């Protein structure tokens, strides 16, 4: 009988520890789930189109990508084409449609040095290194990035 009485408090203590761990895990999960996760309904102007293309850097239209900070526009991919840039430490690719507009002819971005500029009246400007907004800090959406894999003289761009 003493043996059973001795085990009961020990099992109860184990159960309390397990319960505490369960509540701690649930607390961390609930704290990690938040409605404010830096997404904004206005950032849903661009459609999630399937992007899967490759660029041969030996071709003349893409050869300038072998040198840092010479962005290239690739038409007929993504929402408004794709802008690819060699940052010096790697390659980045962004959708060439302004993410702060409903897609239209004027919202296709043009390259101006290391900036992408919207053709609409507000002329939003974005960095072609980070994709961040440059001028109007009230804008919530950065450029839509794509995954770039460098394999020799070929870049594979996808989402």
Where are the regions a protein language model picked out?
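Short cysteine/histidine-rich metal-coordination sites, predominantly Zn2+-binding motifs
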Residues: 112-122, 133-146
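The N-terminal extracellular segments of secreted preproproteins, especially immediately downstream
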Residues: 5, 29-32, 42, 105, ...
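N-terminal pre-ligand scaffold of iron-sulfur
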Residues: 36-113, 124-128, 144-159
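Bacterial Sec-dependent N-terminal signal peptides
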Residues: 9-15, 19-55
């Amino acid at each position: 009988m003493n043996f059973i009485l001795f085990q009961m408090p020990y099992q109860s203590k184990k159960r309390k520890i397990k319960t505490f761990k369960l509540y701690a895990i649930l607390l961390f999960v609930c704290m990690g789930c938040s409605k404010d996760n830096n997404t904004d309904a206005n950032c849903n102007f661009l459609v999630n189109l399937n992007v899967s293309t490759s660029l041969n850097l030996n071709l003349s239209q893409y050869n300038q990508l072998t040198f840092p900070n010479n962005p290239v526009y690739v038409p007929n991919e993504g929402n408004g084409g794709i802008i690819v840039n060699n940052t010096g430490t790697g390659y980045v690719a962004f959708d060439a449609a302004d993410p702060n507009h409903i897609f239209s002819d004027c919202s296709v971005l043009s390259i101006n040095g290391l900036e992408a500029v919207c053709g609409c009246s507000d002329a939003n400007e974005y960095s072609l290194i980070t994709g961040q907004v440059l001028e109007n800090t009230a804008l919530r959406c950065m450029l839509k990035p794509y995954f770039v894999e460098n394999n020799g003289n070929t870049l594979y761009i996808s989402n």
